[in-house]
Amino acid sequence: MDTILVFSLMIASYDSNKNDLRKSSCQVEQWPSFFSEDVRSNKDLVVRVPLEIHTDTKGTPFIQNQPIATLRCLGSGRRVTVHLVYSERRPKVKYIMKNLPVITDLPRNSTASPRCHLRATSQFQNGSLLTAFLPGISQCTVYSAKDRSASSEMVPITTSSTTPRSKGDEATSTGAFPNPLTQGIDMSLKRRQKWSLVVKALIAVTLLLGGAAIIVFVIFEVPCPSQCLRVRQLCQCQWLWRRKRKEEDQKPGTTESQLDSQPEKVKHNVPNSSDSKKTTDIAIIYQTYF
């Protein structure tokens, strides 16, 4: 039973860690910006993946390691962490993106803010949407990865208006493309994580209690408490009472059969005793006369 519980705990931990956000994170060094540390807040970012699928000589599709979006990041001046959540193309279908490096370019103009380039190293379909968390970012503007000229930097082609994440508001608003179903999927992910934690806690408690009982009462042979002894005595008393009752139910038949057989034995034995007396008397008389 303990082996089954251990394997179930391993399976539950694997299922919960499969969608863990910490496994799909990457970091980038953020350069000093125009904003102070007081305006830091967690942001949601949704970008479109404009990658084109190429084919090699064998005809197998692959995606080149090229930028998919350019971020104009104005943050706290510290390290920025990008947590990948999912990539969605159709409702109720999501694609987990685990490899998304972020590269920082130092602008030629010292007054300009640094840019973060998102690069995809996995294969994704065109038109999919990427949802990411950007902690420590005050303001982000998304640019197209194909247009990297000065004019495109001044006038964004694709913009994303981000709002601070709070406990009550987890939605993301975008200006150039439809909003994916982020709230429903995020809630389902959190619900699965919560239930996985509950299941793991129950399995751990069961394993601890079972292991402690086996170690104490079986290995070290510690006697049971008084309550356990009382229960055992009650069980033994009930068992003895039932056994006696069965024996009493079987006794009347045996006694009657014994009583029926005894008179016959007496009847058979009585003639034998009289015959023996007669023979002795005759023998004595014979001896006296001669």
Curated annotation (Swiss-Prot):
Keywords assigned: Membrane, Transmembrane, Transmembrane helix
Entry-linked InterPro entries: DUF4711
Domain of life according to the entry: Eukaryota
Isomerase in keyword set: no
Residue spans crossing the bilayer: 202-222
Broad class of the protein's primary localization: membrane
UniProt entry tagged with the keyword Metal-binding: no
UniProt-annotated location(s): Membrane
Pfam families, sorted: DUF4711
Topological category with respect to the lipid bilayer: Single-pass membrane protein
Regions of compositional bias (Polar residues) in chain numbering: 157-178, 252-261
Region (Disordered) location: 153-178, 246-276
One cellular component term from this protein's GO annotations in UniProt: membrane
Name of the featured protein: Uncharacterized protein C17orf78 homolog
Species of origin: Mus musculus
